[in-house]
UniProtKB/Swiss-Prot annotation:
Residues 230-494 form the CoA carboxyltransferase N-terminal domain. Zn(2+) binds at residues 234, 237, 253, 256. Its cofactor is Zn(2+). Acetyl-CoA carboxylase is a heterohexamer composed of biotin carboxyl carrier protein, biotin carboxylase and 2 subunits each of ACCase subunit alpha and ACCase plastid-coded subunit beta (accD). Keywords: ATP-binding, Chloroplast, Fatty acid biosynthesis, Fatty acid metabolism, Lipid biosynthesis, Lipid metabolism, Metal-binding, Nucleotide-binding, Plastid, Transferase, Zinc, Zinc-finger. It comes from Drimys granadensis. It holds the Pfam family Carboxyl_trans. Its EC number is 2.1.3.15. One of its GO terms (biological process) is fatty acid biosynthetic process. Belongs to the AccD/PCCB family. This is Acetyl-coenzyme A carboxylase carboxyl transferase subunit beta, chloroplastic.
């Protein structure tokens, strides 16, 4: 696997002209000097207009050992110009123009290689010895691994460019005793970047076998909103996850491993074998039984709004399918639909699912994600707790069938007080928020402070409330083993 480095500190007048950019050079502070210490510009022909990438013979930059301060360099660096170095040491200058769909590469590196070397030495000396990056936010763009083909490299370059637009925190690491062998890689962060109260962010640096922290200010960071639709923000570490790959990673944060919310459709795709899903009662919708009206928005209008937003008819999807070849009945709640609240339609769909599984002797999986009973339906929503529990009693106690309850974040209120806690096996996701009454309700009712973490899945697990905490990655395999232990086997086995 080849590794490519994208360094941002490589644009100067030569690149400004060669890339067809017109950025003024009048804002230059102290110039890139030579070994004699001269203050004259080594590259100072600002009147020339060079539009070809291959036209660089009139420029030279020899014996460069003195660079701008980081902030000075950023006063004239082009955001669209990068240096790419492959594993063979060959350097390329890369130009991006997203709006005009231009992607150009030039491998004439007579100037770039020397500038890159000087910049690398400067970074190693400045950051690893002075221990400060307070004047720098952008000294590196992104490190990307390239596989298979040059086409993939181009795609990776574009992805890296998008990463760099919102990158503010970088990590310097070294696996050797020689700082010159260090490589620099950037990680994508969001507005907060796990910033402490004083507004500083940390950089973890490794060198000579020792670790230490460098603190840098990030108060002046203003994230680029242009590519916000490309990223999913983690609720825990505030890191950004590339949306293109986020679904394939089961909505798990790449930075901290936190399990973010999943839609019911994604959970069905995660659990059910392809081509085996058969939904039930899709056309069942609420008719506003108590004619609940709100000053902000009528109940029926709110239902219609969530139906358009999510593509669902209600806050739960029920149906039958196969899990590793084992026929099952499954119900999956969707928190995106009115907070996964349980109204009369949700209760009826779950009850019908349990009755169908009872008649067909199928195991049941219920994936819970709910804020509780739906207040817009009053006591009718509370009645669903008793109705579902009654059907579950017949399924479990009389028919001796197997019910697995999976609690995800959040699971609260009437769902927790009914079928959420009635499973023969109760599984929770890591860090899931699980409670009967929410923290705010308890504090307002009892006038007492609820300790942080007291309603997290890990705390409840240690108190014996669940059977297991299972991450999403192995969940399907765990469920398959549980079913086989209870006598439910794949259809293709004798």
């Amino acid at each position: 696997m080849e590794k490519w480095w994208f360094n941002s500190m490589l644009s100067n007048e030569e690149l400004e002209h060669r890339c067809g950019l017109s950025k003024s050079m009048n804002s230059l502070g102290r110039a890139i000097g030579n070994t004699s210490g001269s203050e004259d510009l080594i590259i100072n022909d600002t009147d020339k207009n060079i539009h070809s990438w291959s036209d660089s013979g009139s420029y030279s930059c020899n014996n460069v050992d003195d660079l701008f301060g980081i902030r000075d360099i950023w006063s004239f660096v082009s955001d669209d110009t990068f240096l790419v170095r492959d594993s063979n040491g060959d350097s390329y200058s890369v130009y991006f123009d997203i709006e005009n769909q231009i992607f150009q590469i030039d491998n004439d590196s007579s100037f770039l290689s020397e500038l890159e070397s000087s910049f690398s030495n400067y970074l190693n000396f400045s950051y690893l010895n002075s221990g400060s990056k307070s004047d720098n936010r952008y000294y590196d763009r992104y490190m990307y691994d390239i596989k298979y083909s040059w086409n993939n490299h181009i795609n990776s370059c574009i992805d890296s460019y998008l990463h760099s637009e919102i990158s503010i925190e970088s990590y310097i690491s070294s696996s050797s005793d020689n700082y010159g062998d260090s490589y620099i890689s950037s990680f994508i962060c969001n507005e907060s970047v796990s910033v402490s109260d004083n507004g500083s962010s940390s950089i973890r640096t490794s060198g000579n076998g020792s670790d230490f922290n460098i603190r840098g200010r990030s108060n002046d960071f203003d994230i680029n909103q242009k590519y916000r639709h490309l990223w999913v923000q983690c609720e825990n570490c505030y890191g950004l996850n590339y949306k293109k790959f986020f679904r394939s990673k089961m909505n798990i944060c790449e930075q901290c491993g936190y399990h973010l919310k999943m839609s019911s459709s994604d959970r069905i795709e995660l659990s059910i074998d392809p081509g085996t899903w058969d939904p039930m009662d899709e056309d069942m919708v609420s008719i506003d039984p108590i004619e609940f009206h709100s000053e902000e928005e009528p109940y029926r209008d709110r239902i219609d709004s969530y139906q358009r937003k999510t593509g669902l008819t209600e806050a739960v999807q029920t149906g039958i399918g196969q899990l590793n070849g084992i026929p099952i009945a499954i119900g999956v709640m969707d928190f995106q639909f009115m907070g996964g609240s349980m109204g009369s339609v949700v209760g009826e769909k779950i009850t019908r699912l349990i009755e169908y599984a009872t008649n067909g002797s199928l195991p049941i999986i219920m994936v819970c994600a709910s804020g509780g009973a739906r207040m817009q339906e009053g006591s009718l929503s509370l009645m669903q707790m008793a109705k579902i529990s009654s059907a579950s009693y017949n399924y479990q106690s009389n028919k001796k069938l197997f019910y697995v309850s999976i609690l995800t974040s959040p699971t609260t209120g009437g769902v927790t007080a009914s079928f959420g806690m009635l499973g023969d096996i109760i599984i929770a996701e890591p860090n899931a928020y699980i409670a009967f009454a929410g923290k705010r309700v308890i504090e307002q009712t009892l006038n007492k402070t609820v300790p942080d973490g007291s309603q997290a899945a890990e705390y409840s697990f240690h108190k014996g409330l669940f059977d297991s905490i299972v991450p999403r990655n192995p969940l399907k395999g765990v469920l398959s083993e549980l079913f086989q232990l209870h006598g439910f086997f794949p259809l293709n086995q004798n």
